[in-house]
Swiss-Prot record:
Residues 844-864 are annotated as: Disordered. Residues 7-284 form the Helicase ATP-binding domain. The keyword Nucleus applies. InterPro entries: ATP-dep_Helicase_C (IPR006555), DinG/Rad3-like (IPR045028), Helic_SF1/SF2_ATP-bd_DinG/Rad3 (IPR014013), Helicase-like_DEXD_c2 (IPR006554), HHD_RTEL1 (IPR049909), P-loop_NTPase (IPR027417), RAD3-like_helicase_DEAD (IPR010614), Rad3/Chl1-like (IPR013020). A probable ATP-dependent DNA helicase implicated in DNA repair and the maintenance of genomic stability. Acts as an anti-recombinase to counteract toxic recombination and limit crossover during meiosis. Regulates meiotic recombination and crossover homeostasis by physically dissociating strand invasion events and thereby promotes noncrossover repair by meiotic synthesis dependent strand annealing (SDSA) as well as disassembly of D loop recombination intermediates. This is Regulator of telomere elongation helicase 1 homolog. It comes from Drosophila sechellia (Fruit fly). Belongs to the helicase family. RAD3/XPD subfamily. GO terms for cellular component: nucleus. Residues 853-863 have a biased composition (Polar residues). Its EC number is 5.6.2.-.
Length: 966
């Protein structure tokens, strides 16, 4: 495999890298080498994933070699004379040793992406590289990995998760019980790179649970964020992810149904039916627990009833403190929330069993309440000022809900107002409500990630531009940034702004014009004329579903729909998840016909966000308008207000209007990225809205698109565009090689029927120039995994605990960080480039974590899993009036230490420090024993405190505890 020297690192690449790939890999290596953060944009089709893997693994391999040489050198060093040699001689060696304490081993690389299918594609790319000898383990959710037939019969992610927890807790899952005895089986520990399907097959063959087997392997390799490189691929929506996963909603009907469920459980207990269902097995909760919880929920319901909504249509906004006041009235506090969440989880498991024997809900409302408490009380008390600035509570009137309640009326059942009564209830507080707890600061979550002392964070995607607003919102220091051009030549892409249709009617999809019949007709005629010219697949993206439906209805009535259908069959993006797969299969089948097909979809939909329309599947894309967020949407209004209130010259945040415009353009960039998927692809991009010529809109498009539009883009007349477009495809078909049949004839095997998030691009392995190897179609071997693209929710349990350190007035210590981030991630962990089966060998990890009730013992959730906490550096008051602080410089630290202790003590300290590098827990205990023996006296205890920064992350909590007990 060819080797290229990039930024001083030898990188093995499957072929000679293109200039854009070299530039990209240079930026990645600079980030890893310097321990800085990067924001890197490289258009889809430029080999971004392959470049990420090869550059990061090449740096890891080089770093590993350097580390091994250092270890050999230190092992040969003779420290028998520590304390008795030439002045300063031994100190320099010890200083070097302590200097490497901040980086005891080779940093790991966590490669994270949005969906399971994207991670599967990354694993396929890894198999193509010279770094494919890495052992691997795939970490997926239960949807992908569970093989228990009864659990898999459950509908919904939450039900599957809870049923799995129940069976593990009750020891009725034979697959999970075999994991411990077979976790070291060669099929699991071998060097072969496994994807999700491979792991499932191994689990079925060994009759063990793939889900828990993969987590055993993860625990064996101690995944921690300290000194780790985090690469977030497909990060174009990272701000929204940070905001949405820190937000939560609870409805009056949810509270009412929770009360009803508790009442039903109490009745079952009272009647003795629970004994019939569970036999003599003791319950995890008592009637007193149920009574207390019901009283608290009744108080919460009363508190929600008392909230006055001034505007029953748009709702009313309150400060974030209102949520804590509301829960406080029901006695939900920081002191008892953990025990309440634990009780809720036990009730969910109880209802799962009960629902199999009687008609009863499975505890979904308990899960909702648990999510609410987990997210709201994840914001620690000492950072409330930042919480109040970053969050808002917005209360809406809940329509047509039936359930528990006290109101009566002709159109009411169980207390909830029916449709038509909301307006009349505006002046009343006792109506069903929706309580939204919204986060508007994405930097709130990113700051927590940085405070874990990761070595680097790299955000990358095909559509990140413009970069400055993204960096400003995330509030992370960025040393490396890149906007790559596309890998294709100018002649392979045709980009034009179409301002008028064939009838010279202006094309502008703004609010004032979208209902204009002349505009709708002109847009249809434009699509008809383009469909006559474009070969194979034509994609048409609309700003919204209502606009799509409006155009379809008008064209069907006027006959335009039939005219377009005569040229190419038309497919509409279905809103139903179940219909999506069949629709896509039919579209790909139509592409195989000579006429091709038209696919009409919406920006931000499944098609625009994830699918791959390479080669014949997508020869042109039409953008019919700018998909601005709903202007009157309460969340949009509050986001704009937040930006205006917090914008300063220093933080360079966008104004509310700039953010509003950018949100639309980013959705356009993502839709455009469905075509031009590789080096030999070609296609046309037609922007059918005259507003695209505005400088403010052009500057927000991806850099490679701006290059085709020029400095001062103008709307082109329709006639010349038709002639140019016809000539473009004539030249392209003559000069570009035909796509391989494997790229167009493959079925859509990676599309899931129950998609939650937009589908990932259908992975295709291309034959690159300079390579004689022939690769099988990725689609032909695509993995069929149920819900492979769904994204599990998570709760940011430690946002504020990390971010709040600055609010306390003290900057966080450089080495004071958590060992784990409680958030949903998908990752590949690159630890080592050897195929050794020894404990020091590396591991590749792909995993996604899901939100689940945070209390079950086997759960990976926050309450049960969190083992570490952020702590401030221990402060010890010396006997003197002026507090002493250990020197920051290593050499100065050692000189002062040697001046304070005896020669024998200093020699023992030096030897213990060197042995500590072996990484065993026993060596830490030996070092602690010497430290406590030598430095526990009040006059020198400040030196003991100063040693904390040189300890490994996993030992700091015990160090704090033992020093705190002095």
């Amino acid at each position: 495999m060819p080797e290229s020297l990039i930024a001083g690192i030898p990188v093995h690449f499957p072929f000679e890298p293109y200039p854009v790939q070299r530039a990209y890999m240079e930026k990645v290596i600079h980030c890893l080498r310097d321990g800085t953060n990067g924001v890197l944009e490289s258009p889809t089709g430029t080999g971004k994933t392959l470049s990420l893997l090869c550059s990061s693994l090449a740096w890891i391999r080089t770093r590993q070699s350097e580390h091994q040489m250092q270890m050999v050198k230190m092992e040969k060093a003779d420290f028998s004379g520590i304390g008795g040699g030439a002045p300063g001689g031994d100190l320099s060696e010890l200083a070097k040793t302590m200097g490497r304490a901040n980086n005891w081993g080779v940093p790991k690389v966590i490669y994270a992406s949005r969906t399971h299918s994207q991670l599967t594609q990354a694993m396929r790319e890894l198999k193509r590289t010279a770094y494919a000898n890495m052992r691997s383990v795939v970490l997926g959710s239960r949807d992908q990995l569970c093989i228990h037939p009864e659990v898999m019969r459950e509908l919904g992610n939450s039900n599957k998760t809870n049923m799995c927890k129940l069976r593990v807790h009750s020891k009725t899952c034979s697959f999970q019980m075999r994991v411990e005895s077979r976790k070291d089986h060669p099929d699991l520990r071998g060097p072969t790179i496994m994807d999700i399907e491979d792991l499932v097959k191994v689990g079925q063959r060994l009759k063990i649970c793939p889900y828990f087997a993969s987590r055993e392997l993860a625990r064996a390799n101690k995944i921690e964020l300290g000194n780790t490189i985090v690469i977030l691929d497909e990060a174009h929506n990272i701000e929204k992810i940070c905001e949405e996963y820190a937000s939560v909603q609870i409805k009056s009907s949810d509270v009412a149904m929770t009360i009803e469920d508790i009442t039903h459980i109490r009745q079952v207990f009272a009647s003795g039916e629970s004994q019939d269902m569970a036999g003599d097995e003791p319950k995890d909760f008592t009637l007193d627990d149920l009574t207390l919880l019901k009283e608290m929920l009744l108080e919460l319901e009363k508190a929600i009833d008392a909230v006055v909504v001034d505007n029953a249509v748009d709702g009313t906004t309150f400060p974030a403190s209102m949520m804590y006041e509301l829960l406080g009235k029901a006695n939900f506090t920081y002191g008892n929330v953990a025990s309440i969440i634990s009780l809720l989880d036990k009730l969910v498991q109880y209802l799962l069993v009960a629902s199999q024997q009687m008609s009863i809900r499975k505890g979904g409302t308990f899960t909702l309440l648990s999510d609410l408490l987990t997210i709201v009380f994840a914001n620690k008390e000492d950072v409330m000022s930042k919480v109040y600035a970053s969050f808002k509570v917005h209360v809406l009137v809940e329509e047509s809900k039936q359930g528990h309640g006290k109101q009566q009326g002709a159109k009411q059942q169980g207390g909830w107002l029916g449709k038509g009564t909301i307006a009349a209830a505006t002046g009343s507080s006792k109506v069903a409500k929706i309580i939204n707890f919204w986060c508007f600061n994405p930097g709130f979550g990113m700051e927590q990630l940085l405070n874990t002392q990761v070595r680097s964070v790299i955000l990358t995607s095909g559509t990140l531009a413009p970069l400055k607003p993204l960096i400003a919102e995330l509030a992370i220091p960025v040393a490396q940034h890149l906007e790559n051009p596309h890998i294709v030549d100018q002649s392979q892409v045709y980009v034009k702004i179409i301002g008028t249709g064939p009838d010279r009617q202006q094309l502008i999809s703004n609010y004032a014009n979208r209902d204009n019949p002349k505009y709708v007709s002109s847009l249809g005629q434009t699509i008809l004329n383009v469909a006559r010219i474009v070969p194979d697949g034509l994609l048409v993206f609309f700003p919204s579903y209502p606009m799509l439906n409006k155009c379809v209805d008008a064209w069907q009535a006027s006959g335009l729909w039939a005219d377009i259908s005569c040229k190419k069959p038309i497919f509409l993006e279905p809103r139903s998840k179940d219909q999506f797969t069949s629709t896509m299969e039919e579209f790909y089948q139509a592409i195989r016909d000579s006429k091709g097909a038209v696919f009409m979809a919406v920006c931000r939909g499944k098609v625009s966000e994830g699918l791959d329309f390479a080669d014949r599947n997508g020869r042109a894309v039409i953008i019919t308008g700018l998909p601005f967020p709903p202007l009157k949407d309460p969340k949009v209004i509050l986001k704009r207000r937040y930006l205006e209130a917090n914008r300063t010259r220093e933080n360079q945040l966008l104004s509310g209007q700039e953010w509003y415009n950018l949100d639309a353009t980013r959705a356009v960039n993502q839709a455009i990225g469905r075509v031009i998927r590789h080096r030999n692809d070609y296609g046309a991009i037609l922007l059918c809205d005259s507003r695209f010529k505005d400088a403010s809109q052009v500057q927000q498009l991806s850099k490679w698109i701006r290059g085709h539009l020029g400095d001062r883009p103008q709307c082109s007349p329709f006639g010349p565009i038709v002639r140019e477009l016809r000539q473009f495809f004539k030249n392209a078909e003559a000069n570009m090689k035909l796509p391989d049949e494997r790229e167009t004839d493959s079925p859509l095997e990676t599309v899931c029927k129950t998609e939650v998030e937009p589908l990932a691009a259908i992975p295709k392995v291309k034959r690159e120039p300079g390579s004689n190897a022939t690769f099988k179609s990725a689609n032909e071997s695509a993995i069929k995994v149920e819900m492979a693209n769904s994204i599990k929710t998570w709760t940011p349990a430690d946002y504020a605990s990390a971010a709040g350190r600055k609010l306390g007035g003290a900057a966080p210590n450089a080495m004071d960080f958590m060992s784990r981030l409680d958030s949903n991630v998908s990752s590949i962990d690159f630890n080592c480039c050897t195929d050794s089966k020894s404990g020091s060998s590396g591991l590749v990890k792909i995993h996604k974590r899901e939100r689940s009730s945070p209390t079950a013992p086997e759960s990976t959730s926050q309450v049960s899993k969190k083992r570490y906490k952020l702590v401030e550096n221990i402060k010890v008051e010396p006997s003197s009036s002026q507090a002493k602080v250990a020197p920051e410089d290593r050499a100065a630290f050692l000189r002062e230490l040697r001046s304070l202790v005896t020669q024998d003590q200093f020699r023992r300290f030096g030897k213990a420090l060197l042995e500590y590098k072996n990484g065993t827990y026993e060596s830490f205990q030996a070092l602690m024993a010497i430290l406590l023996d030598v430095l526990s006296a009040p006059k020198v205890r400040y030196m003991l405190v100063g040693m904390r920064k040189y300890l490994k992350n996993e030992h700091k909590e015990e160090f704090d505890r033992r020093v705190g007990n002095l």
